[in-house]
Structures are given as C-alpha cells and as structure tokens.
Amino acid sequence: MQEQGFILWFTGYSGAGKSTLANAIAPKLRALGKRTEILDGDEVRENLSKGLGFSKEDRDTNIRRIGFVANLLARNGVVAVTAAISPYRQIRDEIRSKSQAPFIEIFVDTPLELAESRDPKGLYKKARAGQIQHFTGVSDPYEPPQKPEITVRTAEEGIDACVTRILAYLRSRGLTG
C-alpha cells in the first residue's frame, strides 16, 4: 500500500519564516520515514516560472504551478512542503479545492515590521524606494487565511516550537504514521 502524501502550505509575508520552517520540518518528516520535497517559492520561480513577473496574474500563475506540482507529489505519496508568499486567498483556496490529498495551510503570522527587519536581500527597502513594483506588504496586499489549519507566530515562538506544534497537528490527523 502506498504511503499517503499531503501538502503543507506555508503562507505569509516575505521574511515571515516560511522557508526557514519548511527547511526545519522537512528533515523531521524524513526521519519519520516520509518522502518529503520542498517547493520553495524562490526556487520554483527561478526554474518553473522563469519569465513571469509580479503582476497579480503572474503571481496567480506561479502559485497555480506550485499547487499543481505539490498535488502531483502528494497524490504519489510524497509530502509536499511549500514555502511561497501566495498572497491571494482565492488562489490558495483554489489550490486547496483541487488537492487530491490532505492540504494543511500554515499561516506564518509575522508582523510586517518584523518580516521587513529580517529582510536579508533588501527587498522591502527596494520596494519602499519604488524600485520593486507589486511587492506584498508594501504596494500589494497580503490576504491572511481565514481558517488555516495551523497558525504559527514566529515573533513569539522559536522555530523548534513551531515545528513541534506542526508535527503534533500532523500526528493528531494520523499523517505521520
């Protein structure tokens, strides 16, 4: 019998901690015997969505591509861990509705000021200077999930505590074996 895959969909501002959490939880899932792949928004944009800009239409296309690959992995027994801003609720809900495996939305709820202070690439600074258009939290909106399965607050909890809570949730759903 094939292992059940599922999707962990991390969403939040740039600098919220999505990639950090994805990279922290993936080895824990692998240690539990779960085949696990990370779909990082920056890497997907570079490899599958090259040529797309940051208009709403292009962002929606990028997120749909991530959702398609995540669903493909999950329905083949892989845990797909996604880390992408995915700022628009309607597209996240669309991905959830198309998922053929359990979809766990994880809202990385970080105050914009903190996310901005963590910005190693200087993207917020460039956006505030008008050098980057359509930047979430500056010139474009972020629509928080209305009913995420899990909310983590990286301003209040350490990464290990967040990962522990996520793993506890997955255990409670019978997804970690």
Give, region by region, the residue ranges found by the protein language model.
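Hydrophobic anchor at the beta1->P-loop junction of P-loop NTPases
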Residues: F10
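Small-molecule kinase domains that catalyze NTP-dependent phosphoryl transfer to phosphate-bearing small molecules
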Residues: D109-L112, S117-R165, R173-G177
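Conserved lysine of the Walker
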Residues: K18
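Conserved beta-strand scaffold positions in the cores of enzyme catalytic domains, especially
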Residues: I38, F103-E105, E149-T151
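Phosphate-binding P-loop
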Residues: M1-G5
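The conserved Walker
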Residues: S14
